[in-house]
């Protein structure tokens, strides 16, 4: 059973169709003029994309100087590739300033086009990697290596500085012998506890000798440029536990957490 249309809806439909026939379409697409009645806003731009197709039926060869004769079947195509699904290429830029998690000045980076255009280029943090810009920054790097320009922190150095600012070092010392903390011991604990390789000459401890347990500090200089003060706790040395003992502790903890089965009656 067909659905009936209300008389009011039918009247509105016929009125709209009549308005379109009488020039309403031109009115819709007419450009907006200042001071006149507001027009309609339409996006008339086409979606720009490329689709690769090939003919389903091969076109027979034609004679020399003649065009091939196409039949209806030769206008049937099959889709080979839609280029909008291709992975988008990155944008190569040269940084003019240090940017967190991307690089430092002079680094050639490859980023997404959205990041490069909306963040780096628009804020003056990078320039396009043109041959002229590449040559300019290569000359700047060579001058820095020769010592004619001030050195800047490397990307790894900036990451190290950021990591050390959030660290707390714990140094274990025994109580059965006399000891005095020195940069060599602190450097070993940096590598053992934090996984950071620190040269002893890059460490600076308090002037007063450290011979007791307590809370102290140490200064770490990264690449001779940035210095970070790391809080340090000197505590009682505890012998590291073996893997077998840790496995046994985990089993005991699992047994204590597991629910006990009720006894059958």
Curated annotation (Swiss-Prot):
Which branch of life, at top level? Eukaryota
Which residues does the Swiss-Prot or TrEMBL entry list as transit peptide? Answer: 1-49
Q: Which family does it belong to?
A: Belongs to the bacterial ribosomal protein bL9 family.
Q: What is this protein called?
A: Large ribosomal subunit protein bL9m
User: Can you name one GO molecular function term for this protein?
Assistant: structural constituent of ribosome
Gene that encodes it: Mrpl9
Please give a single GO biological process term from the UniProt record.
mitochondrial translation
Assembly mode:
Component of the mitochondrial ribosome large subunit (39S) which comprises a 16S rRNA and about 50 distinct proteins.
Where in or outside the cell? Mitochondrion
Query: A GO CC term?
Result: mitochondrial large ribosomal subunit
Q: What is its main location?
A: mitochondrion
User: By its UniProt entry, which InterPro entries does this protein fall under?
Assistant: MRP-L9_N, Ribosomal_bL9, Ribosomal_bL9/RNase_H1_N, Ribosomal_bL9_N, Ribosomal_bL9_N_sf, Ribosomal_bL9m_C
Which keywords does this Swiss-Prot/TrEMBL entry list?
Mitochondrion, Ribonucleoprotein, Ribosomal protein, Transit peptide
